[in-house]
């Protein structure tokens, strides 16, 4: 993990298209600004982890739905 020290108003760049700026610090909270391309999704970690879990659950449900649907079709016999 790269660890950097920045003061309010200072920024850092990730590649050519992402800029992170420290906007302010109050106690234990840091306010940051992100400049990212419009097509890039940005999530807070707790939201991102929740989305991943919901996607995982949806895939598991879809797998069981596919298996249930497959049981509805008669098995082919070799003729």
Curated annotation (Swiss-Prot):
Compartments in which it is found: Cytoplasm
Assembly description: Homodimer; the beta-strands of each monomer intercalate to form a hydrophobic core, while the alpha-helices form wings that extend away from the core.
Primary role: A translational regulator that binds mRNA to regulate translation initiation and/or mRNA stability. Usually binds in the 5'-UTR at or near the Shine-Dalgarno sequence preventing ribosome-binding, thus repressing translation. Its main target seems to be the major flagellin gene, while its function is anatagonized by FliW.
HAMAP family xrefs: CsrA
Organism, as annotated: Solidesulfovibrio magneticus (strain ATCC 700980 / DSM 13731 / RS-1) (Desulfovibrio magneticus)
Keywords of the record: Bacterial flagellum biogenesis, Cytoplasm, Repressor, RNA-binding, Translation regulation
GO cellular component: cytosol
Protein name: Translational regulator CsrA
Name of the encoding gene: csrA
Family: Belongs to the CsrA/RsmA family.
Domain of life from the UniProt record: Bacteria
GO biological process: bacterial-type flagellum organization; mRNA catabolic process; negative regulation of translational initiation; regulation of bacterial-type flagellum assembly; regulation of carbohydrate metabolic process
GO MF, one example: mRNA 5'-UTR binding
Chief site of localization: cytoplasm
């Amino acid at each position: 993990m790269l660890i950097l020290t920045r003061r309010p108003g200072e920024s850092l760049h990730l590649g050519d298209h992402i800029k992170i700026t420290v906007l302010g610090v109050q106690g234990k909270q840091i306010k940051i600004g992100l400049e990212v391309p419009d097509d890039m999704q940005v999530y807070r970690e707790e939201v991102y982890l929740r989305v991943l879990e919901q996607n995982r659950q949806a895939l598991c449900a879809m797998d069981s739905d596919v298996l249930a649907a497959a049981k509805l079709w008669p098995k082919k016999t070799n003729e």
